[in-house]
Amino acid sequence: MIPITTPVGNFKVWTKRFGTNPKIKVLLLHGGPAMTHEYMECFETFFQREGFEFYEYDQLGSYYSDQPTDEKLWNIDRFVDEVEQVRKAIHADKENFYVLGNSWGGILAMEYALKYQQNLKGLIVANMMASAPEYVKYAEVLSKQMKPEVLAEVRAIEAKKDYANPRYTELLFPNYYAQHICRLKEWPDALNRSLKHVNSTVYTLMQGPSELGMSSDARLAKWDIKNRLHEIATPTLMIGARYDTMDPKAMEEQSKLVQKGRYLYCPNGSHLAMWDDQKVFMDGVIKFIKDVDTKSFN
């Protein structure tokens, strides 16, 4: 457990180190907010095979870390500061520190790069657009692919804010999540554990009750750093996927908006392409890290 200082007190966050490699240290940032590291266990086989040093990590508020209840903690700047404290604790620096963020973890990774890129060697943003309003617009596009009667029932439940209604999940799972979150017929145990352990209080406060866009009153709803991506000079990999909840064309555009970007497209993947288009995803991530490490990235 790593001690973390915050404006409302001191807490501890859970991390687990794999391997020892002074040249490559990768910190994995999970999504949610307030999911867990568990769904990112898929990196273990691939990164260990390459000899990378990497860290699974539960952000503050997540299941394996402390879960304070002060709502002042749940904002981007505070999470960015937490990542910087974790970096120091794992003795990573601009010569070896790679951040890989998926979904909300991608928001955190981009925001970290904007504030602390002097400490960063490589940035990997998996399946996260740089604008929450644009993401919400794309969710509208995808939601219209659902059967009209299904969408009508989903919207009716949302209008009543009856999110605890089991019917809400019953509708979203086969009609949206199985298409756009993870397309494997059977969801991996690691992903199911992560879902079971989500801190729904933090998740709902920051993003809303489901993966179908964001609530207009969620703390992340107006988040948009697209016009700041040009400030990021760290070598960056943006990952998009055909069936993702995030527009793959936006992910490609983001790779051109940063100063040194590369785009990885997963033609069979969704939001968790690390699982459902695994070979393409992992091969691309590993190549990026090796290219940056050997100074052959361009």
From Swiss-Prot:
Disulfide bonds: none
Domain of life: Bacteria
Domain AB hydrolase-1, first and last residues per copy: 26-277
InterPro entries on file: AB_hydrolase_1, AB_hydrolase_fold, AB_hydrolase_sf, Peptidase_S33, Pro_imino_pep
Reactions performed catalytically: Release of N-terminal proline from a peptide
GO MF annotations in UniProt: aminopeptidase activity
Organism, scientific name: Elizabethkingia meningoseptica (Chryseobacterium meningosepticum)
GO biological process: proteolysis
Active site, UniProt feature: S103, D244, H271
Protein name: Proline iminopeptidase
Family: Belongs to the peptidase S33 family.
Temperature dependence: Maximum activity at 42 degrees Celsius. Stable at temperatures up to 44 degrees Celsius, showing 50% of activity after incubation at this temperature for 15 minutes (at pH 8.0).
Gene (UniProt): fpaP
Quaternary structure (record): Monomer.
Broad class of enzyme this protein falls into: hydrolase
Functional summary from the UniProt entry: Releases the N-terminal proline from various substrates. Cleaves specifically Pro-betaNA and small peptides containing proline at the amino terminal. No activity against hydroxyproline-betaNA.
Keyword line: Aminopeptidase, Hydrolase, Protease
E.C. no: 3.4.11.5
pH effect summary: Optimum pH 8.0.
One Pfam family per UniProt: Abhydrolase_1
